């Protein structure tokens, strides 16, 4: 029996599959859930920081979380002071960035997205620094709008209808393109200037969404190490947290979660752990519901699981898996798998049958199932051809070529487009003509022409289109008369 080939599928995304030696079954539970935060369209500055601490994988109510929150409160106290309030909005917006670098930020590290780590050792990236700037600007009454590009995040403040960008990864990043006077000695003025940047594909996002990018960066990094135990709870919390956002944002967050689910199943499949993979997907659906992408993953996983079982002659296992999981896959995959199992069962049944019995079984399949997959139709036709040829060969081996040709003719009536059967029928008739020729040779050599002609005429009745017999008969009649 031929092996069935796997459908191979990959996830095209920035979140990709890495190597792994051991794999823990991840929990499908969120890292955290605060209903009072998740249900709001807009959060206060302190609620944004609380969410940022949680997304940084620190319990905000723990001693560590409380310490981080208090460090933030100390900064918020400064920006909400009367001294700050007495300045213009533009001055406040600029001074917030200066304050961040004087008190907290010290070293840029591209992948350091955690707010907690930023407060602990001063390392930061565009997301963590933008979250801090946004919260402080919001606390002192500024209108601050996060900005996102495919690879960067920053903030903008709106002051008197003017949109001012703030590149939070640089202490002089307020309003890029303008000069910032530096402290200097000897009455010499010095300036710093950050070139104005024309950001490609920039998009305004919500304040809640900016905070959630902490989680997105983290689970992206975890996926590179196949750390699904950490990636899934983060992605699930992010999805729940963004439920008040637009449909597009919500769908993107759910899609990220489904990508993680899919990558995990691929890892399991690479280890031939199909049943674990299917049970995991069932758990995913029970916990967070299904989507078209997750159903597609489920369908492909079950298909590959059935292929694996059938290639290992485990028809019973394949039927059990199909029975358990078929309701969670697309209908077209249900049809594919059902046909595949049916054919394997049929193939096994055919192993202990005669050719005649096999053809009866194959004919009966048309009354029991309508095949939709071309490869399955071709496989059934190949089996029919095989057993018809076996019947033909049985007669040919006994040199019953006319009977063999009749069997071939019967087969052709059932499979009219089968060129191989037509070729075999013609060969049977040709072999019959050759047999008749060989039969008359000794008669002709002994000059028993009448008997030879009689044999040829009888042969021509059975095989009226035989060129061999006609040629022999014409030559012999000329010679004999």
Predicted regions mapped to residue ranges:
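Secondary-structure boundary elements
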Residues: 49-117
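Hydrophobic/aromatic-rich core segments of domains that either
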Residues: 128-190
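His-Asp-centered catalytic microenvironments across diverse enzyme cores
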Residues: 163-271, 275-287
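Amphipathic alpha-helical repeat scaffolds of TPR domains
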Residues: 205-224, 251-267, 295-308, 335-347, ...
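Short coil turns that delineate tetratricopeptide repeat
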Residues: 243-244, 289, 330, 370, ...
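TPR alpha-solenoid repeat register
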Residues: 248-249, 253, 294, 334, ...
